[in-house]
């Protein structure tokens, strides 16, 4: 199933963003349920790649569970975080404030947050023209 205005998914190793072809410019990056099941380096790689490939006024959309003010928003998210860290100590539910610090280093600012079902969030980061 193909849409004319949406590119096919790109498989990328965000822990090695310098190895990714950055010749194309995109309007957005859609990232769903990745930040918490990846090394922190992948979050940094995501915004590094976004800086190189997203057009001015483009955005990065993140979906998944996040902490607010470095605290879990529910007991189920806290338990989920523990389970993730047992599987891999470099995984875990991230604080949105930590993600915001990384995004800002690469010229992206948090524009909007939406609470979603099952204690998840949609976070939209836009690329500042000054980045």
Say what each PLM segment does.
Residues 1-21:
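S-adenosyl-L-methionine
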Residues 19-29:
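A short acidic, Gly/Pro-enriched loop at the edge of an enzyme's catalytic core
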Residues 27, 31-35, 63:
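Residues lining the SAM
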Residues 37, 68-77:
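Mobile active-site "lid"/loop adjacent to the S-adenosyl-L-methionine
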Residues 37-53:
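A short, conserved alpha-helix within the catalytic core of class I
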Residues 56-69:
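Conserved beta-strand signature within the Rossmann-like core of class I S-adenosyl-L-methionine
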Residues 73-97:
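Conserved Class I S-adenosyl-L-methionine
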Residues 106-131:
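Core SAM-dependent methyltransferase catalytic element
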């Amino acid at each position: 199933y193909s849409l004319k205005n949406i590119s096919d998914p790109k498989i990328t190793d965000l822990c090695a963003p310098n190895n990714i072809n950055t010749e194309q410019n995109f309007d957005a990056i859609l990232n769903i349920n990745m930040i918490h099941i990846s090394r922190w380096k992948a979050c940094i790689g995501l915004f590094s790649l976004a800086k190189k490939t997203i057009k001015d006024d483009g955005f990065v959309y993140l979906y998944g569970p996040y902490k607010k003010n470095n605290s879990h928003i529910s007991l189920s998210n806290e338990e989920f975080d523990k389970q993730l860290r047992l599987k891999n100590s470099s995984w875990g539910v991230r604080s949105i404030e930590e993600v915001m610090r990384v995004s800002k280093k690469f010229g992206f600012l948090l524009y909007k947050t939406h609470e979603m079902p099952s204690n998840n969030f949609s976070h939209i980061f836009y690329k500042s023209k000054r980045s």
